[in-house]
Each structure stands twice: as C-alpha cells, then as structure tokens.
Amino acid sequence: DGTWWGASDWSKDGKKILIQNYISITNAKAYILDIQSKKKEIILGSDNTESYNAVLAFDQSDKGIFYITNEFAEFNQLAYKNLITNKIKVLTDTIPWDVDGFVISMDGEKAAFTVNENGFSTLYLLDTMSKKYRKVDRVPIGLIGGMEFSEDGGRLGLTINNFQSPSDSYVLDLKTNPLLFGDLTRWTYSEVGGLNVSEFVEPRLITYKSFDDRPIPAFIYAKECLEPQPVIISIRGGPE
C-alpha cells in the first residue's frame, strides 16, 4: 500500500504482536495482530486525523502498551495506553522536549528513555508500574543510542557519541528499585586516527534570533583566538 509495516514487540504469552504502520513523519498508526486468527486491530492513530504514534512495547502484564506520540502536544511524548479501559496517560507531560529513544527490560519492570534537549540526549529511568521516572545525572554530554538491558535487568548498556568520541559503549549499573542506579562505566575507546582528543573543541550551545524573532539554537565549535575567524553554518533538516 506504499507505507511501511513492521513488528515492534511480542506479547509475553506469544499470542499477539504489536505492529507499526509508518505512513509519513506526521502520520503513523499501530495495530495488535492476533497470531491465531491473523486479524489486526488498530490501537493507535485514526483515519480521520493525522498524528505520529510509534508503538514501543507491551507492559509486563500485556494489558497496556508504551508508545511515543505527538497527539497531545507539539513534542513527541512518552505515553501509556491501558488496553482494557483504552485510557491514555501521557508520562512526560512536564518535559518540553522530544522523547526519541526507549527500551524496556525483559521482565517488563524497568524501562529507560532518552529526550533530545536542544541537540543533547538526556537519559531517564522509568518504573513501569508506578509510571514514575528519574533523570540519570552522570552521563557525559552527547547523543545516546543503542540502549539495551542485560537479561537480569541489572545493567543498562548504551552508546554515547560526543565531541571526543565517535561512538563508545557504556554500562550503567542498576539497582532492584527501577529508579535507582549506580556507576556508569565506559567499556570502549574508539579509534580517532591517533589524534589527541584533549585538543578537540567542545561545542557551545547558543541561540540567535531569526528574521521573525524566533530563537534558533546552534552549536559553536570555536577555539580561543585573538583574531576573527571565518564561519561555516551547517543547517540540518527543515520544515516537514
């Protein structure tokens, strides 16, 4: 049909699959596919109004789902839908940034998600039962990806890309309480061609006004120097 279809998660009993239907960057739906009957039921999105809905995972009881949506705000928010009552709870309604990553532990008791704050990733831990979350405050500034829980849920693996590292692996020690964590340990040191990373320039986040007085965020990579230097402005993305 010209759109993209893919599987997001299996139910714990192995009888159902969460199916993602991506139509465009502003329109995505989700379904539950019953393996035995081969029938699918729409659970997120509508034919009448467009909204982005990225289905992520079943909860530990298979009675609800976690997903990312822009239906209720100008940001992509993390939300939870109870499949029995059809009630929806936006979990990150106090975070004015896009949620762009999510992972859940094998037992479904813990989850982690990332938020894009002006170009940098912020990591949060989520208690899937209480729906409370906590910011992890000991992660180096950069872009976070590749998140995965260990089988026992005691560790969270992730990659961090920043101004001194193209992408390196880190492991965050976790406690029994889903919101408690221990040390963050770096596991790899990527090849940078023999360059001295201490001389790499750390970007500085600034904002400047556009022609219509909108604040535009930008990163400046500039070494200390006495004379004015030429500047290259690289613009990523645009209206969609």
Residue ranges, per PLM feature:
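Peripheral, non-catalytic segments that deliver or gate enzyme domains
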Residues: 1-227, 238-240
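Hydrophobic beta-strand anchors of alpha/beta hydrolase catalytic cores
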Residues: 230-234
